[in-house]
Each structure stands twice: as C-alpha cells, then as structure tokens.
Amino acid sequence: LIGTGTLASVIALKDFMKEHNLKGTIRYYGCPAEENAGGKAFLVRDGYFNDCDLALCWHPEQGRRACYGSTKANFRVFFTFHGTPAHASMCPELGRSALDAVELMDVGVNYMREHMIDEARIHYAITDAGGDAPNVVQSRAQVLYAIRAPKIPQVKELYNRVCNIAKGAALMTETT
C-alpha cells in the first residue's frame, strides 16, 4: 500500500512538472522494512539522498493532510524467556514459567510509562506464548517491544530501563 501510494504521487508530480514546464529530477526509492528494520536508514547511510533537495513520503491514515517534521527514533527488540516445563496440575512447583516472566515484564513496563517523557511510546506484542496447552508450565515465551522517543539517546535510556525490567521478571520467575 505504501509503495503503491508513493509511486502514484511520483507519477502525479511528474505530470505536474511537465504541465507547468518545471525542470528537475524525480527519483523513486522503495524503502523496505518501513517500520521494522528501517530501510531508509541504509539508503541514507549509502548516500542515496546526498544530492536531494526534497524527500517526500506517504503513509495511509484517516483523512487527508500534509505534515512535516520527523518521526520518532525506535528500537525493536525481542525478549525471550526460558523456564522449566512441568505439568501445571500435577507438579506445578517443579516448573518455572517463561510466560509468567513475559507477563510480569509487560506489567513492569506498563508501570514505567508514568515515569518517562510524554513524547515516548512503548508498544509490545507477545509473539510466542509458549504453546496452546494451558495445563503445562510454559518453558519458552517471547515478547516483541517497540521503544520510541524523539531522540536516539532517549530511546537508549528507555531500552536500558526495559532491559532491567526484563532482568527483574526473570529473577522473579527463576527463568533466563
């Protein structure tokens, strides 16, 4: 959707320039991993925008508007916990739940939100709950966090705090 919408804007801009006899060069770059791995960062690093006077992008949203500015710096990081499986009814005391660690981490991060800058955002998704059997203490679980703030040093600070919360969750559940 993003690539198609941006390509349509390139075609419209080309037509506008031709109609108004405007000189210039238009370059269209697809930017893979728009949010997850930051495809644009590699293009910037490799000099694709060095002689560029203007860079435009398009992103779907509600309504129509033009905006300017910058987006937030972000880290996306997986946290994987490993525990000890056990039968949850017969011998739960032998288990160490990786899923409990993920849930405690999520609670800790949610409480941290009150104590971070207003412009920061932290989102998460449980990507592996350990299985679909509720009668088993889950030995592996994983959560993906997206940590965002206006500046990279702010993201790094939040990332370190999130890592400490993960360590605390592992300590509480005797998982790794």
Go through each PLM region and give its residues:
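Short HxH-centered metal-ligating active-site micro-motif
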Residues: 1-2
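Histidine/acidic-residue-rich, glycine-tolerant segments that coordinate divalent metal ions
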Residues: 5-9, 13-139, 148
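A conserved active-site cap/scaffold subdomain adjacent to cofactor or substrate pockets
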Residues: 135-165, 170, 175-176
